[in-house]
Amino acid sequence: DYSWQIVDGGDVRAAGPFALAFSGGHHATIHRSIPIVDNVGVFVNETLYYPGDSFTVPPGAVEVLAVPASAPWLKIGEVMDYLDTVRPRRAFPTHERVNSDAGNAMANARITAVVEAHGGSVTVLQPGE
C-alpha cells in the first residue's frame, strides 16, 4: 500500500529522505486539437530535476537534469534551447524509448553538445539502468 497526494506547481513535500519541490502546472502542447492536461516537474533534494512532459525551468541551479529527449510534444531544437537555459552540470536523456537507435543517436549527440558546451556531462542510460 502506498499513499499519494495530488500536487501543484509550488508545492513542497517530503517522501522519506527525499525533499520534493514541484514546479510548472501544464503539459506541453502536443497539438491544438488535444486538450492540455496538468503536469508538474519535480526537484528532488535540490539536486535532480525532472520536468515531466514540459520544458518548465526549475526554481534553482540544477546538478542533474532528467532531460526529455523525444516525445510527441517536443522537437530537438526545443530540447537544445531548454538545455541552454537550464545548464545542468549533468544530464541524462529520458522519454527516449519512442526513438529508433538512429533517432536516439541524433538526440543524444545534440543533448551532449549543448550540455558539454556549458561545462556539463551527459550519461546515456541503457534499459534496466
Protein language model regions, located:
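Conserved residues at the C-terminal ends of beta-strands
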Residues: N45, P68, T94
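Core dinuclear metal-dependent hydrolase active-site scaffold
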Residues: W4-G60, W73, Q126-E129
